[in-house]
Amino acid sequence: MSYNNKSIKELHELLVNKEISALELTKATLSDISAREPQIDAFLKITEEKALQDAAAIDARGINPDVVTDGISIAVKDNIVTEGIETTAASKILGGWIPPYNATVANKLSESGLITIGKLNMDEFAMGGSGENSSVKPTKNAWDQTKVPGGSSSGSAASVASGQVRLSLGSDTGGSIRQPAAFNGIVGLKPTYGRVSRFGLIAFASSLDQIGPLAPTVEENAQLLNVISGFDKNDSTSSNVAVPDFTSKIGQDIKGMKIALPKEYFGEGIDEKVKEQILAAAKHLEKLGAIVEEVSLPHSKYGVAVYYIIASSEASSNLQRFDGIRYGYRAQDIKNLEDLYVKSRSEGFGPEVQRRIMLGTFSLSAGSYDKHFKKAGQVRTLIINDFAKVFEKYDLILGPTTPTPAWDLGARVDDPLSMYLADLLTIPVNLAGLPGISIPAGFADGLPVGMQLIGKRYDEETIYKVAAAFEATTDFHKKQPIIFGK
């Protein structure tokens, strides 16, 4: 029997009432995975034996009635370090690496009774927006297996949308949770920078990376954020701002709330059908009592250029640690130390990772630092100031998550620029360190369209409040791809 259509609250009730054991639920989840995974390719590793052991241990101690996640399965993006379980960031250069420690979020999952059932596919080192940059295999979209699932958290979104797992963790550097969530018709949140510990997240761009939750509904997403948030002394960028109950405002009236609609988010390059769905969603929020007004974020048009200079520069520095010596892939038939470095990195990194390392190295070079990297930092400040100005008057910002619905697999592989522009609407949120969510808001040609809600720093509660109000009065989140019911 499959339980993939039940919320974690409903599953928890079954567990507490002993209508099902954690072991039985885990076996049912493994069965859901084996039925759907061959068509989706969301997983890099399924940790069946450990998951069953963990479930049996939970049954032996008894389900905690006060912890809604106790005994529930979750899958984790493969750039989140898991002790004793191979972690590769979908890269050949980390093939076979078994971490000797857990990421802070991995510890938090097990402390809250969540059972990690596997590691999820992704774009290599989280660099990509389609899921096609994995060195292992491309993940497929849950709604149409000829389409991309989005990236870089491709497996995180597709595994949830296809009914394999109820919850997953991803990471978001320029849209890598929100964009695949939009393409697969689920809920994905990038928390405020510093809200969730990055200790044990394989670094891409350290001033932008953030771990976040993916789930079928707003409430489940908030319940998972409750688990993973909080200060961590192991992460120097972790914030000790108090962690609220992120579900506390769900169900509240949104009457009188002020929502900003940036005109730049509806301009050139935005698909007409996507625009139509998002403007209809804005009208719907007005019917619920919100005040929606047009605003301007004038510097957002520079976001993509700024991001690719800053992110690539940080990646160029972060990825120097993969050298073929300490761990991971090591080239054979080498002549000397320099040859070892060159061959290991050339053979171990995929083309997109190499492209970004080169771009970052160039941006940091003596002749380019002031002209590119320093200037990008200055424009980043202007983008931050734009948001701050809007938030003086408004509670939230609303727009599309992506300019288009999911495109065909292979369509943009040889066109990195068009791939980069797909993150046009999500990137500014990372540059400003703000929280942002994508929720299902309609369909275009049978493919999901995501609406993005952007909030003030550390105000994920308000995002969830408005997202839940929209979800409760629409049916988009109830629609499921064919594969879900198989």
Swiss-Prot record:
<comment type="function">
    <text>Allows the formation of correctly charged Gln-tRNA(Gln) through the transamidation of misacylated Glu-tRNA(Gln) in organisms which lack glutaminyl-tRNA synthetase. The reaction takes place in the presence of glutamine and ATP through an activated gamma-phospho-Glu-tRNA(Gln).</text>
</comment>
<feature type="compositionally biased region" description="Polar residues">
    <location>
        <begin position="132"/>
        <end position="144"/>
    </location>
</feature>
<keyword id="KW-0648">Protein biosynthesis</keyword>
<comment type="subunit">
    <text>Heterotrimer of A, B and C subunits.</text>
</comment>
<dbReference type="InterPro" id="IPR000120">
    <property type="entry name" value="Amidase"/>
</dbReference>
<dbReference type="InterPro" id="IPR036928">
    <property type="entry name" value="AS_sf"/>
</dbReference>
<feature type="active site" description="Acyl-ester intermediate">
    <location>
        <position position="176"/>
    </location>
</feature>
<dbReference type="InterPro" id="IPR004412">
    <property type="entry name" value="GatA"/>
</dbReference>
<keyword id="KW-0067">ATP-binding</keyword>
<dbReference type="GO" id="GO:0030956">
    <property type="term" value="C:glutamyl-tRNA(Gln) amidotransferase complex"/>
</dbReference>
<comment type="similarity">
    <text>Belongs to the amidase family. GatA subfamily.</text>
</comment>
<dbReference type="GO" id="GO:0050567">
    <property type="term" value="F:glutaminyl-tRNA synthase (glutamine-hydrolyzing) activity"/>
</dbReference>
<keyword id="KW-0547">Nucleotide-binding</keyword>
<keyword id="KW-0436">Ligase</keyword>
<dbReference type="InterPro" id="IPR023631">
    <property type="entry name" value="Amidase_dom"/>
</dbReference>
<feature type="active site" description="Charge relay system">
    <location>
        <position position="77"/>
    </location>
</feature>
<dbReference type="GO" id="GO:0005524">
    <property type="term" value="F:ATP binding"/>
</dbReference>
<protein>
    <recommendedName>
        <fullName>Glutamyl-tRNA(Gln) amidotransferase subunit A</fullName>
        <ecNumber>6.3.5.7</ecNumber>
    </recommendedName>
</protein>
<dbReference type="GO" id="GO:0006412">
    <property type="term" value="P:translation"/>
</dbReference>
<feature type="active site" description="Charge relay system">
    <location>
        <position position="152"/>
    </location>
</feature>
<dbReference type="Pfam" id="PF01425">
    <property type="entry name" value="Amidase"/>
</dbReference>
<feature type="region of interest" description="Disordered">
    <location>
        <begin position="130"/>
        <end position="158"/>
    </location>
</feature>
<dbReference type="InterPro" id="IPR020556">
    <property type="entry name" value="Amidase_CS"/>
</dbReference>
